[in-house]
Amino acid sequence: MVAMLFYVDTLPDTGAVAVVDGDEGFHAATVRRIRPGEQLVLGDGVGRLARCVVEQAGRGGLRARVLRRWSVPPVRPPVTVVQALPKSERSELAIELATEAGADAFLAWQAARCVANWDGARVDKGLRRWRAVVRSAARQSRRARIPPVDGVLSTPMLVQRVREEVAAGAAVLVLHEEATERIVDIAAAQAGSLMLVVGPEGGIAPDELAALTDAGAVAVRLGPTVLRTSTAAAVALGAVGVLTSRWDASASDCEYCDVTRR
């Protein structure tokens, strides 16, 4: 069984004791019921991991001694998901699935046809919730890096961001059900980075699509079916994993299998 992962702010040196408390400690000791003698992996969320053995466990956390540390290189090319704000019941699902599928960063987008509207205090509240979902999903999928979540971008702000990304060598793909280009026909493997733009339930407005493509984005379709905004990014990330070198590593070379062979 693959060892469970929990995040800490700072990883101690090899031989030192790490204290896992707060939400992570509660999840490890109370929810997952990890006990002394068991091994787990701790991560700092930015690429460094440590194999540890638990020495003490209580209701609110545990103490574990670091056996070994290592760093995981970032996956290339990196993929940023621009997610238009879905309805509340779909919002967290979209971010959760995309994190598990490998998104490296998220940008929240207030598109014209969004039913949800984040303004004022809702911006901070929404971003905090998305970040919590991303952290949980990253832990569940054993990711060495917790994807950052930023926004909320207006359409003009997104258009400017797209223009900058394209100028820097990125491929920006707008997922659209009426696109004539297929994602498999885009030379994504040669791009320095990728950006996937996912519209809201009502779709991307024609003027928004025109502005994005004028800025250098390419409208693409994933396949013959129309996907929900909550599942589109995850499916696209799967396609990108196959079409680029992101999934080239064999099982024995994956960031997590690494702990069993060192």
UniProtKB/Swiss-Prot annotation:
Top-level lineage group: Bacteria
Protein name per UniProt: Ribosomal RNA small subunit methyltransferase E
Job of this protein: Specifically methylates the N3 position of the uracil ring of uridine 1498 (m3U1498) in 16S rRNA. Acts on the fully assembled 30S ribosomal subunit.
Pfam families documented for this protein: Methyltrans_RNA, PUA_4
UniProt KW keywords: Cytoplasm, Methyltransferase, rRNA processing, S-adenosyl-L-methionine, Transferase
Main location: cytoplasm
GO MF terms, alphabetically ordered: rRNA (uridine-N3-)-methyltransferase activity
Lineage of origin: Bacteria, Bacillati, Actinomycetota, Actinomycetes, Mycobacteriales
Keyword Methyltransferase among UniProt keywords: yes
PANTHER family: 16S RRNA (URACIL(1498)-N(3))-METHYLTRANSFERASE (PTHR30027:SF3), RIBOSOMAL RNA SMALL SUBUNIT METHYLTRANSFERASE E (PTHR30027)
GO biological process: rRNA base methylation
Reactions listed under catalytic activity: uridine(1498) in 16S rRNA + S-adenosyl-L-methionine = N(3)-methyluridine(1498) in 16S rRNA + S-adenosyl-L-homocysteine + H(+)
E.C. numbers: 2.1.1.193
Miscellaneous: Was identified as a high-confidence drug target.
Broad class of enzyme this protein falls into: transferase
Subcellular location as annotated: Cytoplasm
Gene3D superfamilies xref list: 3.40.1280.10, Hypothetical PUA domain-like, domain 1
Record family assignment: Belongs to the RNA methyltransferase RsmE family.
Entry GO terms, CC: cytoplasm
